[in-house]
Amino acid sequence: MRILVVTQHFWPENFRINDIVEGFVQDGLDVDVLCGLPNYPKGEWFPGYSENGPFDETYKGAQIFRAREIPRKGNTGKTIFLNYVSWPLYAAAALKRLPGGYDAVFCFNTSPVLMCWPAIKYAKKHKIPFTNYVLDLWPENLYSVLPVKNHFMRWVAQTVSDSLYKRADRLIAMSEPLQKRLIARTGKPEKDVAVISQYCEDFYAVPCPDPDLQARFAGRFNLVFTGTMTPAQSLDMVLRAVLDARAAGAEDLHLLLVGDGMSREALQALAEELHAGDAVTFYGSVPAEKVPSFTTLADALLISLSDSPDLGLTVPGKLASYMAAGKPVIASMNGAGYEAVKESGGLASPACDQAALTQNLLALYRMPAADRAALGARSKAYYEAHYRRAELLRRLESFTLRGE
């Protein structure tokens, strides 16, 4: 069977859709991908790419058709807005390049929600089912990144988002709370809104010691964060909590930030302002396959989200990769993610509660190594039970192609 995958962000950008596409191909599907030109998260073209392409490539057996976009250079409100609106327009124009013959259309819908519009356009024209995998709920996620205060603009964002979600034949939510919200907003029957968690690639479950990294960060209690740095992660609060914990006795507690994003420069400036010194390291982005080297050296893994009720509807994909590593997870978040961390034996505090996060950091720091290892084992067991790649891929394929 043939499937068209629509996603603004794709290889060589580091998103889970890369592995989903590889999994579809491994399972015998004929896959084409309509995507953008790689410039996330810095807004700079990746090596070998420019506004002039290349527009046709292959990846792990899938055919790639790239559409232009205005890069999000500088990650200002203006450039992010232009990036959000430009790619769907260019992608819609690029639909005529697709060879056709698809049995279904699948959208990996991170931000912006507008990226599903070309998928809707193609599916309706060719009368094939369209499934939208909702990773970022809009317009709520937009407000966590850009301060949209104008009431008319907020009304437009809400109306457009609801309209796009309604036009999908099927929706996939990451959690039951998100499923209920999507059903309420679209009026779709429950059978057309599936709950399928984000899995992680199998390599996250394999320890990967890196002697150089371990030597560099030896003698510290390494609290590791991996992924994108945006206002939605509230990492400024995390940094303050780490410094509070160090002042309370956790003197070698070390925050290791592995990743990049629109908040990195502001966080670095805050670290200087607070005289954080060796309490924090900004390591920068690494390929996904390199992340296990950092989770292996970690004493604990950190996940955080800002205090937004709508962010609490989702479970970040990185949580699965953290649990797969078999290390204690410490979380500052609300809702579905908070509950998953608690169920798996991790330490969770409400979003943006700096004092509570500080206390959890101190509790984990003071915990005997054997007890921390036991927490990590519980985390790994939860991953095995809920986030295995093969099962979740099978469910994605079945629901997208057959609605089952």
Predicted regions and their residues:
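Conserved donor-binding/catalytic core segment of Leloir-type glycosyltransferases
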Residues: 214-233, 238-242, 256
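Conserved acidic donor-binding segment of nucleotide-sugar-dependent glycosyltransferases
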Residues: 343, 347-355, 363-369
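Nucleotide-sugar-dependent
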Residues: 233, 287-294, 301-324, 330-340
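Acidic anion/phosphate-binding donor-loop and adjacent secondary structure
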Residues: 29, 183-184, 191-192, 199-215, ...
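Nucleotide-activated donor-binding/catalytic signature segment of Leloir-type glycosyltransferases, i.e.
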Residues: 258, 265-290
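Membrane-proximal helix-turn-helix segments that form the acceptor-binding/catalytic region
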Residues: 114, 121-125, 151-171
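N-terminal subdomain of nucleotide-sugar transferases
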Residues: 1-57
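Carbohydrate-associated surface elements
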Residues: 37, 177, 196-199
